[in-house]
Amino acid sequence: MIVGDMERKHNINLFLLSVLLLMTAACSTTRNLPEDETLYVGVKNMEILNEDKTPAGVQTLEEVEAALSYPPNNAILGSNSLRFPIPFGLWIYNDFVKYQDKKGVGHWIFNKLGSTPVYLSTVNPETRVKVATNLLHDYGFFNGAVTYSVDSLKNPRKAKLSYKIDMANPYYLDSVMYLKYPPRADSLIRAAYDQRVLHKGDNFSVLKLEEERQRLSTLFRNNGYYYFRPEFITFRADTLRKPGMVSLQVVPKAGVPADAKRPYYIGNTSVYLTGYKGEEPTDSIVFPGMTLHYSGKKPGIRPGVLAKRFFYQKGQLYSQARQNFTQEALARLGIFKFAEFRYAPQDTLPGCDTLNVRMNATFDLPYDGELEFNVTTKSTDQTGPGAIFSLSRKNFMRTAATLSFQLKGSYEWQTNSTADGNSSKLNSYELGTSFSLEYPRLVLPWMSKKMMSSRFPQHTSFKLYASQLNRARFFKMLSFGGTVSYDFQPSRVWKHTVTPFRLAFNTLQHTTTRFDTIVDKNRSLKISLGNQFIPAMSYTFTYDNAPLKKRNNLWWETSFTSAGNLTSLVYAAFGKGFKETDKKLLNSPYAQFLKMTSEVRCLFKVGEKQHIATRLMGGILYAYGNQTVAPYSEQFYIGGANSIRAFTVRSIGPGSYRPEDKQYGYLDETGDVKLEANVEYRFPILGDLYGAAFLDAGNVWLLREQKNEEGENIRPGGLLTLRNFAKSIALGTGVGLRYDLTFLVIRLDLGIALHDPYDTGKKGYYNIPKFKDGLGLHFAIGY
């Protein structure tokens, strides 16, 4: 028997060695190159002469180097010179190119895993140096030049490139003058002089000239010059007056049309509404500021709702900004299939300075229905299907509001064995429904028309919901409630959400003996899961610079929640102390706490398709007054696919505490304080397949020791202290795959635990008893 095993192992080793030798023999990266092509393997050297280290010079050099850079096959981080030593993509291309025009598995492997060779002709260095030289000239380096040379390698079918960049002396602006503009336009230029892009002493830059041209055109169009265009502005540059200096004149182009030289005022506004079935307008109504043409007995939308989205009035100067605000506000209503504006002179008389406005719009379908099916796999060993049915009525009661109904349900079963040996049986379900009414404005009685007519999005949402959660072998819980929330965005990057009313009620309909045994040992857990109201209000602000389209993105969100305090103030007004406990709302206890969370995410672009993503999240929850334990749904937990991926959900914390019954102890692993940090490097592998390497750290802690009736600490090690803070941080690393389907990203992560916050019986910082015990596999959707 032993001899047989040895023979099998020997045969396997021979087979693997044979495969390796065959791959090595076949793995030529130039075997299938066309005869007249050379494989490009990167940039050998990029020499800089007369380098300009000023901010303008650094920016110029970055642009020039970007124009010259071209990553070869298997580049590291998009580098033009660093490459991975094993070119799998090229090997696959060479071995499977014969399947390029065929069908089957070979064709799929070629398309998805193969990497097309980067030829020297593809890089086209001659064209690149011309582009780079033009960039130098555009940035004011008129004497600059870029040259290249081809460096042959040991393999004559491969080559590298070397570039030489001579920045020579740059030119600067000596003077900037705005000449030959009509008096009114000249006054506008002088009034906005502080906003100019061009300044004396700046580096000469063609890009800055174009930016100034756009600025002036926008300035004129925002002040009545409807027919003005950027191309009506030209520049005169004199480089002979002073060596290395440019005397610049910004002047109108010769032959500017007469109608572009005068401002226009807004005349009559007419709105033509076409039904979603194509019904043409048959009637009209005159409303202050507009004439509304519609089909049917009534306009499809209330005239007042429409009028509040128009940011101009009759007699005002035409403004491109107000036109853009109006179009954006109408698009946000979500009730039109399309809407277009046309401006035309009020008459054909010479010198006419009035534009009539016509808006043509077609209503979208009034109902939206959606049926969504999904399969959920959770890191708590729960998996199962779910479904969501949604039905929305747009333009409800002709107010542009949306009335929505949603019905959802899901089933889950446990995929591992339970403590009593049972396995894989249906053990959980959730059913829920909700009604919501959302207005595209702030619905407040004291809100002025000016505040309601914000150029940025505003929403008011009223929502009622109910859900039933059944955790077999534990409990059945019914939750219902309602919210009123206001969203408004004062700028492109800032958003505020105010929820002045949020009332939820949780009640346990049924519990099992196993669940009762767990909570009887922990009074705090019993209170947090008990029947109670949660009367709360909250405020959230969000910063997101993604609309600015910067290279690196920053997202920051902070939330503040207050629960039960207003209710306790009402009780205090009637003689019950603010700190008095066991007060009730509708004959049930209510929660009282303060909660704050903050999360920052940064996404840094380090290559063409490479990113480094960082995340820092913290939160604190303080329960007091009526109840010193916050509801279970509000407490913090950690672990899982979107947290520390080396650990499953609620498998660590608080602090270094470890439940005696680990199988069901996750109910007890929550806290009042949370700190979590992640850093992840994302890089392309092949085609739409991306890889990731990550590092996660964090934990949850308690603000107070929790004791039983005998005064014993029931969660030792869970208290937040500076003394053991570092040791109580869980740490994990890992790698993952991301498959980008454009409309969603499928994510598979393998987490590897490096440090467990509790005593595992193993000494040292790496205290994972067995390597396999520290592995966590997570499947998820989205980043």
Mark where each language-model region is.
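Membrane-embedded beta-strand positions of outer-membrane beta-barrel proteins
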Residues: L371, L403-L407, F462-L464, W556-F560, ...
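Flexible glycine-/small-residue-rich
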Residues: N50, I165-N169, K180, V250-A254, ...
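Bacterial N-terminal signal peptides that target proteins for export
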Residues: D5-F15
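Gram-negative/organellar outer-membrane beta-barrel architecture
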Residues: L188, P299, S319-R551, W555, ...
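C-terminal outer-membrane beta-barrel translocator/porin domains of Gram-negative envelope proteins
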Residues: L292, G296, T376-T380, T497-F683, ...
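C-terminal beta-signal and adjacent terminal beta-strands/loops
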Residues: A697-L719, F743, G751-Y766, Y783
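C-terminal motif of bacterial Sec signal peptides marking the signal peptidase cleavage site
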Residues: M23-A26
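Interaction-mediating elements
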Residues: E7-R8, S28-R332, F341, T354
